[in-house]
Amino acid sequence: MKKHLIYIILLSAMLLTLCHGQTHTLSGLSPQRFASTIEGKPTSLYILRNSKGIEACITNYGARLVSLMEPDRNGKLEDVVLGYDNITDYHTKGQNFGATVGRYIGRIIGPKFTIDSTTYTLQDNGKGVISHGGNPGFANRVWDIIDQTEQKLVLRYISPDGENGFPGKLTTILTYTLLEDGALEVDFQATTTKATHVNLSNHSFFNISGNPVQSVEAQYLWIDSKKIAEYDQHKNVTGHFYKVRHTPFDFRKPHAIGERINNDNEQLNITGGYDHAFALRHSGDISKTAAILFDAKSGRTLTT
């Protein structure tokens, strides 16, 4: 199996820190390069910053986390998330870097589902599935800003009934909050007018070394999981779980990401590396730690 340069993608609340609406950024991003109009709505770059000077930048296009400046063990601030430095690339290159993905992250086969005896046919991407809620999805929408302070940004998107086949008008409120202790809270709230399926997520890619071209294979990862969602050869979930014991997916004892990534394993071969959903042992309890990532060179730790 070929060796892969990979980024860490964590699809839940992030315990690192965050940027506020000023005219300059520590990451070097220019707010002017995010000032545009997409589908008749203005886009901007918003900056959150705490008293320690830690900064995160967010754009309302896709409610995306654009940059996250975090200190290493010596206090040097570096960007630890992958992204572009302008709105045009986010709009045209089709990547979900830092985006809010919805209505449903992942794939739905068919693509259809049944709720209360009613079957809903969803948008087909040409491969018999709908992926990440379809196109355009939440990542391709310009969100409304409904509140902003020094350390908080609140965004809203209203998905109309029937968008990409999903039932119900879905109103999503997303709040980014930068706390004084250095934690970044990412909070989703959604209400619907009909019974529906919702699976929202942030799609940030992390490299906590602070160097976007450096492999993450030397970073140590711990995940509180005994099993993953099994994929078929087309990278669609089978509905079965795959036990991680005695496989490269067992991170219950922390080890380097690259330690087993080149092992001959059917699930690894399907995805070309680690790109799976880990079933947490404490499902539904957000007070429990799900995963910890550590970079020895920089001293940074990411906890979710």
List where the protein language model places each region.
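Bacterial N-terminal signal peptides
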Residues: 8-17
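An exposed, glycine/acidic-rich loop-and-rim segment of catalytic or binding clefts
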Residues: 23-56, 60-303
